[in-house]
Amino acid sequence: MSAMSAPSDELVVIGKIVSVHGVRGDVKVYSFTDPIDNLLDYRRWTLRRGDEVKQVELVKGRLQGKILVASLKGLTDREVARTYADFEICVPRSELPALDDGEYYWYQLQGLKVLNQAGQLLGQVDHLLETGANDVLVVKPCAGSLDDRERLLPYTDHCVLKVDLDSGEMQVDWDADF
């Protein structure tokens, strides 16, 4: 394991170390990938917590309920493993699989300005939530927004009409009064 600096804009967060598991230095990981165990396809992780950055290598991992248990190269002590809690697990964007047209990674949607069909700026995508039925866009007010309300919009074909990454905008079918 080594310390390094990596431009954070080239990295995508795919999970987070939440705690230690067992006595041999394994860690419990919350995965942001779908399916959950896709995170285990990436063998080299960049760990990030605040300004602290480390490179680690995944030796093995397994799904245990809704959490992953991972063994990292050189990490064999429970107390040392405990210090890894709250590190985000990142990989370079270039390692993510290509998507079909009209499909987007969540990180690509974050920061997009959201306009309704009347051209009203509702806000900016802050983050997304996974609800089970469909993902939900959390749209927070930004400079030039119609008002200062936070909105929750379903990320569905019916609601999201167009995504334009180049212009940094998303058009939605959404009444400003909702």
UniProtKB/Swiss-Prot annotation:
Xref: Gene3D superfamilies: PRC-barrel domain (2.30.30.240), RimM (2.40.30.60)
UniProt xrefs under Pfam families: PRC_RimM, RimM
Major site of localization recorded for this protein: cytoplasm
Entry keyword annotation includes Transcription: no
Location relative to the cell: Cytoplasm
Domain PRC barrel: 101-178
GO molecular function list: ribosome binding
Keywords: Chaperone, Cytoplasm, Ribosome biogenesis, rRNA processing
Domain of life from the UniProt record: Bacteria
GO biological process: ribosomal small subunit biogenesis; rRNA processing
Stored SUPFAM superfamilies: PRC-barrel domain (SSF50346), Translation proteins (SSF50447)
Record-level GO cellular component terms: cytoplasm; ribosome
PANTHER family per record: RIBOSOME MATURATION FACTOR RIMM
Domains: entry comment: The PRC barrel domain binds ribosomal protein uS19.
Family to which this protein belongs: Belongs to the RimM family.
Function, as annotated: An accessory protein needed during the final step in the assembly of 30S ribosomal subunit, possibly for assembly of the head region. Essential for efficient processing of 16S rRNA. May be needed both before and after RbfA during the maturation of 16S rRNA. It has affinity for free ribosomal 30S subunits but not for 70S ribosomes.
Subunit structure of this chain's protein: Binds ribosomal protein uS19.
Protein name: Ribosome maturation factor RimM
Organism: Stutzerimonas stutzeri (strain A1501) (Pseudomonas stutzeri)
Lineage: Bacteria, Pseudomonadati, Pseudomonadota, Gammaproteobacteria, Pseudomonadales
